[in-house]
Amino acid sequence: MTRPVRTRFAPSPTGFIHLGNIRSALYPWAFARKMKGTFVLRIEDTDVERSSQEAVDAILEGMQWLGLDFDEGPIYQMQRMDRYREVLAQMLEQGLAYPCYMSAEELDALRERQREAGLKPRYDGTWRPEPGKVLPEPPAGVKPVLRFRNPLTGTVVWDDAVKGRVEISNEELDDLVIARPDGTPIYNFCVVVDDMDMNITHVIRGDDHVNNTPRQINILRALGGEPPVYAHLPTVLNEQGEKMSKRHGAMSVMAYRDAGFLPEAVVNYLARLGWSHGDAEIFTREQFVEWFDLEHLGKSPAQYDHSKLSWLNAHYIKEADNARLAALAKPFLDALGIEEAAIATGPALDAVVGLMKDRATTVKEIAEGAAMFYRVPAPDADALAQHVTDAVRPALADLVAALKAADWTKEAVSAALKATLGTHKLKMPQLAMPVRLLVAGTTHTPSIDAVLVLFGRDVVVSRIEAALA
């Protein structure tokens, strides 16, 4: 009988989380949702010196922002130490593990001799119990590590969902340390116990874990567990072709939110960063879950492309509800010095956002464009001298008169502009540029008629009249 699908995301909270990391959460999340299974969040925090609550919070915040909800967890390895010690004791009792008293200095010397002899450096089994073998006398006052009795013969084989069939001879694997002298268990051991206890059926993770897999499979089988399906994802490269990392300039997941990206755009982009569904570039979260499979995971490293993500974000911004975008824009407006009172007494932010979003690739850009509606204009003196000339002043005066009498609609404002152009034999930029400067404080705005309608008749008329006085 097929086991119910159970996947996991098992990050180490030792630093910030970037897109390459969070992709290892997205794919197992999607597979669990597709298969009506269970998605488990496990925090692998046994590296006490490097782990931090701040990093845990960043993981949880990033997952929440992207909508990667988990069914179980977060489960912390440090809270499972009693269980690990129980299994270690069981392995010692059953002869699956043994104490090793070889010191770090002795191990280094052994490896150096092996290198000089042209051999692969590895533990030589000095303290491994064998029938008829006489072990050295344990040195006084030395606490041993525990090593797993790896099979000496045979081959570890698994059918990786990405890499295909992988075979590793047991002769290439030495007896792995599974507990330190103070009794604390090692990562590779904890992972096996966790995956077994949590009935994980599919392990979807980065291919930097491939070398751990044969060791983990051997420990799992020794404990009577059934190996999961493994899918080792190729590395995510940055735009320079290096492995994505903080050291090489990767942004944290939440930095994308803070730069004005929408979570649905990031999820869509991440989904395509190592998986494909035909030629589909843009798809909803629901479509992604429906289409996701392990068979179409990419076999080559995927390279991050910021311009592609920006293009996707621009698409989702155009599709997004104006009220939602307005709420998202407020923190950016606040950072630009626009106070809540100015927004409350100015043009409706929903409408302003609706006008600005077609020109923006991020919510931050929407806010930067929207700010002119909530500030007193301070146009550049050189720009004023260039555009608000004596030749155009009569046209501005006529435009003000027309706007005072017009219905306050985009169509009526457009008609007033065109009528003024005709009367004074001007081209649109000759009139629109000074109007933009005087009303908005900048020459860069969307369609002038739409902008004037949002500013409102009183503001438009008073600002142009003030310049003509």
From Swiss-Prot:
Query: What's the name of the protein?
Result: Glutamate--tRNA ligase
Question: One of this protein's GO BP terms?
Answer: glutamyl-tRNA aminoacylation
Quote any Pfam family the record assigns.
tRNA-synt_1c
Q: Superkingdom of the source?
A: Bacteria
Reaction catalysis annotation: tRNA(Glu) + L-glutamate + ATP = L-glutamyl-tRNA(Glu) + AMP + diphosphate
Q: Name one GO molecular function term.
A: ATP binding
Q: State the function annotated in the UniProt record.
A: Catalyzes the attachment of glutamate to tRNA(Glu) in a two-step reaction: glutamate is first activated by ATP to form Glu-AMP and then transferred to the acceptor end of tRNA(Glu).
The record's keywords, sorted A to Z, are: Aminoacyl-tRNA synthetase, ATP-binding, Cytoplasm, Ligase, Nucleotide-binding, Protein biosynthesis
The subcellular location is: Cytoplasm
